[in-house]
Amino acid sequence: MGDIKNKDHTTSVNHNLMASAGNYTAEKEIGKGSFATVYRGHLTSDKSQHVAIKEVSRAKLKNKKLLENLEIEIAILKKIKHPHIVGLIDCERTSTDFYLIMEYCALGDLTFLLKRRKELMENHPLLRTVFEKYPPPSENHNGLHRAFVLSYLQQLASALKFLRSKNLVHRDIKPQNLLLSTPLIGYHDSKSFHELGFVGIYNLPILKIADFGFARFLPNTSLAETLCGSPLYMAPEILNYQKYNAKADLWSVGTVVFEMCCGTPPFRASNHLELFKKIKRANDVITFPSYCNIEPELKELICSLLTFDPAQRIGFEEFFANKVVNEDLSSYELEDDLPELESKSKGIVESNMFVSEYLSKQPKSPNSNLAGHQSMADNPAELSDALKNSNILTAPAVKTDHTQAVDKKASNNKYHNSLVSDRSFEREYVVVEKKSVEVNSLADEVAQAGFNPNPIKHPTSTQNQNVLLNEQFSPNNQQYFQNQGENPRLLRATSSSSGGSDGSRRPSLVDRRLSISSLNPSNALSRALGIASTRLFGGANQQQQQQQITSSPPYSQTLLNSQLFHELTENIILRIDHLQHPETLKLDNTNIVSILESLAAKAFVVYSYAEVKFSQIVPLSTTLKGMANFENRRSMDSNAIAEEQDSDDAEEEDETLKKYKEDCLSTKTFGKGRTLSATSQLSATFNKLPRSEMILLCNEAIVLYMKALSILSKSMQVTSNWWYESQEKSCSLRVNVLVQWLREKFNECLEKADFLRLKINDLRFKHASEVAENQTLEEKGSSEEPVYLEKLLYDRALEISKMAAHMELKGENLYNCELAYATSLWMLETSLDDDDFTNAYGDYPFKTNIHLKSNDVEDKEKYHSVLDENDRIIIRKYIDSIANRLKILRQKMNHQN
């Protein structure tokens, strides 16, 4: 066994690797992604034989789905050999890593030609000559010469034809996955070029499809429903979560060809739902920029590829037989310039320099950190790392003076903004949808793994008391617990901060949930806990619950029990006096419950407040208001709304809500385990507030949902780290329930945030149409009030605690006062969190600040300065004061009992 040697002292590769053709030497790191590092390398025995070495750490593939994606890629690449597909030379596995020895493409990927052309013409000797021989149609946009377009179209078609013969669909065709190898290496003329199986123009860089992490075997008649691909190049049927077949690749080909011609994708939007709406609204009418001179035959082909309905879209056989795809390109081949091109190609090979090394600065885009081999490094799903490099949503969040200045400066460069938007959108897709897949996959794995008969106990600073979680378990659940060997009476431990009160002194949340509203129907707690508990956790009648039990898999009969969620949530919130910051605890079986419960409590109070805002935007139906005992009451917020709607309002629905309702009523699944049942009972109307107030409400709700997503994402990452480091793949029922609760809230927050984004964009469009025509876009935007997450939580926490104190003085509803004080404390603790950029367990959660970029140190400092030290001192004083009130209240309650 020989070592992979490394000439670059900045990195270290010391793992043993035996290859059939000899040992390999890793030279310079050329790409680094979420799960892999890509090195430029060569055969140790022959330095002229260059390879790309993709090192994938097993430790990073904690999710079974990620490991499966890598295994799929390896299996596919082993089976396919084609001149226009990046080849797998060798593959080795060790106990800690995978090594994929792959064909080396020194010219990066297609995005270099599209986005970095001017820099390449100045610095890259070969590409400078190529662009001189095949000049772009315009200096003002990123379109390529017709020779490039047709050559790469034919090479794409050749590779796809081969994939179809193997019943393979790639599912992620995009410029970043189309790598370019140096021409005139291994052949010297057109004849030898075509004899090797290549198509197209022999003296242009050769296009090769890479990254088969999303690919799968899919016969022409089969349908898939996994959300894969990058949104700007994704077929509409995938964007709309519909089943799709191999024709999805043809749509992606159409978008790539359009971008090669025009320099920009055919459709752009800030999220995949907006993108789908734009595509559908276009009604198969593809608009080509006026600066693009494209012949009718090529336009017709692009339009046939970009057909909305897959059934009407051009088929593979028709595509392969198309006149443009089969056009003779020999007239573009430059025999006279062959010696010069051949000499410069050999110079590139001999210099052994990657394309990015020729540029003045390492390109942060179009390929982010990977410089041409991003697709290889990010491959088995481009999942977790995107959380630290991109944003969930684009609506306003916590703003600073710095970020506002950045926004204003960026608005002066529309072209730059469009490129940044494209790249940001591609990353956003990874954040939202792939993280959702990861969260649900992990929750399913934990749920199905079984329970540990020795449950993990909850550590507290005082005595532990095991109390009955639910005295009214159904026979089904009773039997299930017995089969699993765990007593349902050991599922939760309530604790008191001041002595030995009986654990049964407090009524269950099911008994109390309607009385919660007596705290004050207009404040946040009544809405947050009343609405969230009754509408979102419960509300199903006995018959519906029985139907769910009979139709659900065994593990879900208990784990998704709404009564269990009621008790779990309440007791976590009430355990505020045992708050331990997760960062101070070691991640092991002893502390996992404390860590997850602290994070779950923070997520719940933020989520609950987001629900208040959501219910103001989309009011509850009359039935639900009756269930929650909120009829005929009005909010006292500055954004006060009437909860009752005139019957006429129910007849008016806007397009966004119609779409949302259709999804809800069909309980469409957004990734495994993600359903819309929680929101399927919404009423059919929006409130009739002024648009400016509705926009503010949407902004506030989105910011709160995003913060909840950030905490929930961190919780699932902590769970993932613990789960995959654990020797035993089993856990207590308590941990299992916590994981399922985190999954449910993550999916719901994600769904509602997406919905609100669509709503706020519609509101902004309508609002903009009402302002004076001479008002500039910047003036319009500046009218929106900035939203600060910390201020939202701080103000609401004080409001809740003041109302609780007022009721305590009257001696009313002491149980609810206790819950109110605890909720207030959790909110204040959450407002002090600075963990949006770091994570004690080595991974990054979602960012909640839209305008910050993870690599910008100055922005991070500005973010943390939203609360200065004086602000923090004030908040800590309030925490101490409210905690003292809570302690006194509990002593009073214990004395009464």
From Swiss-Prot:
Q: What is the effect of changing S680A?
A: Decreases autophagic activity
Q: Where is the Protein kinase domain?
A: 24-325
Motif LIR, per the record, lies over: 429-432
Which CDD domains does the UniProt record give? STKc_ATG1_ULK_like
Q: Chief localization class?
A: cytoplasm
Indicate the impact reported for S34 to D/E.
Answer: Impairs kinase activity
Q: Which reaction does it catalyse?
A: L-seryl-[protein] + ATP = O-phospho-L-seryl-[protein] + ADP + H(+); L-threonyl-[protein] + ATP = O-phospho-L-threonyl-[protein] + ADP + H(+)
Pfam families named among the record's database cross-references: ATG1-like_MIT1, ATG1-like_MIT2, Pkinase
Q: What, per the annotation, is the impact of changing S769A?
A: Decreases autophagic activity
Return the broad EC class.
transferase
Query: This protein is called what?
Result: Serine/threonine-protein kinase ATG1
Q: Which organism is it from?
A: Saccharomyces cerevisiae (strain ATCC 204508 / S288c)
